[in-house]
């Protein structure tokens, strides 16, 4: 495949054109008065969105050099969303401003490496400043963060705050589409396993088609159980106690399953069985989690334990277990135990070390299950277009809320970035001359988000920026009302993590663009044009078909 190679100023300008094309489409969504973007879909109705990352992901430019610039902005937006969950549009506006100001200086002869160094050093100092001014999130502030990020939807803000309160900081909150018109919150207490009863004969509540057991003993093993002989010793011990028994195994089949069903039907023993969740190594980890949660032991031949010698002490206990066709919920009621906290800390260390998004999600799920909380926000709307837009807003709000709980909050509406700009002169005092230019580029770029918020609200951006610069730390511009007020008191707040991530990611990509000296991209293949009137020319001869009046003329075919 042939390549196109572009050098020096030409390469940087191509990147800038790509950056501007994408950033100009994304930045109009910023702020409470952000405009909508209409996305054409190959199939179905167009989608109306007010979400920066969604717009960014949809854009692909025809020119391969410019498309490289657009891809860099997509990287900024994606990375910010992955780390902080929100702030993608702010990061896009920042990186566009940094690149625009930076390229002006590179074209004027400033050393791009020194510029990058100045940008990096300034950003590092400003990140430390964000940590200093951030306030921990308490009570109603959680609802305020969620309300702002969901496009000022107070109902959503209250719902997310309620979910966070119920599942605690270790819990998992997910967003799903609902079949109804309303948006509802559903909280699952205890550990939920995505496995249901092996046999419907275990059902105890015929109306709900569920198995409901209380004060339960739990046998946890990674074995496949086929013979009842292996289970007899445990069954006899549990029968003497008069408690129900849940068996969690790789599978229960044949003679073993038949005997359990018969004993359940005759009322000899209240028993149920489910398959172990997960696969491979993850299955063992999940079974170990269940064992720790229920104060039991994983019976595995790998560690020298067998079913026929299992003692009562090896069985876990639970206050209540509900088994449905596809799910099982275990309420252990002792999630504050030191062993559980140790297990959570161990999984959290694994979470810090993993680079895989899938593994990260599964580890976070395990933490939530051990901590005893999973909440589901079921999003409803009248139309599919509205549903998708509402779901995106709620996901943004949820991510912003998690970020706020993690690192605290700062005044929103671009005010914190304006405050950081006022610190740059102090930061750059000991920089080299060209590094100071890099610091000034950051200073000017920090004004861009507030200017854009004001422009989107129909105000004069430069005037708003000038007024906010001269006000106290908490006082800023409320674009929703057009007033200057105490932003924290008004509930216009940003998670510190979002501001930090947006600034760091924007500075990182801007530095890459400024120090780019060459771009190598694949040369687009020219679409091969069909030969002029290929085949159609022959069709002209079809006119002669009229002369075929007598098929006898076909005798001439003998020439072949």
UniProtKB/Swiss-Prot annotation:
Q: Which residues bind ATP?
A: 29-32, 86-90, 413, 478-480, 494
Does GTP-binding appear among the keywords?
A: no
Q: Give the keywords, sorted.
A: ATP-binding, Chaperone, Cytoplasm, Isomerase, Nucleotide-binding
Which SUPFAM superfamilies would you find in this protein's record? GroEL apical domain-like (SSF52029), GroEL equatorial domain-like (SSF48592), GroEL-intermediate domain like (SSF54849)
Q: Name one GO cellular component term.
A: cytoplasm
Query: Is the keyword Isomerase assigned to this protein?
Result: yes
Where is this gene product found? Answer: Cytoplasm
One Pfam family hit: Cpn60_TCP1
Q: Which GO terms describe its biological process?
A: protein refolding
This enzyme catalyses:
ATP + H2O + a folded polypeptide = ADP + phosphate + an unfolded polypeptide
Listed EC numbers = 5.6.1.7
- Its predominant location is cytoplasm
- Name a GO molecular-function annotation: isomerase activity
Q: Report the function annotation for this chain.
A: Together with its co-chaperonin GroES, plays an essential role in assisting protein folding. The GroEL-GroES system forms a nano-cage that allows encapsulation of the non-native substrate proteins and provides a physical environment optimized to promote and accelerate protein folding.
Q: How does it assemble?
A: Forms a cylinder of 14 subunits composed of two heptameric rings stacked back-to-back. Interacts with the co-chaperonin GroES.
Instruction: Give the protein family.
Output: Belongs to the chaperonin (HSP60) family.
Q: What is this protein called?
A: Chaperonin GroEL 2
> By which gene is this protein encoded?
groEL2
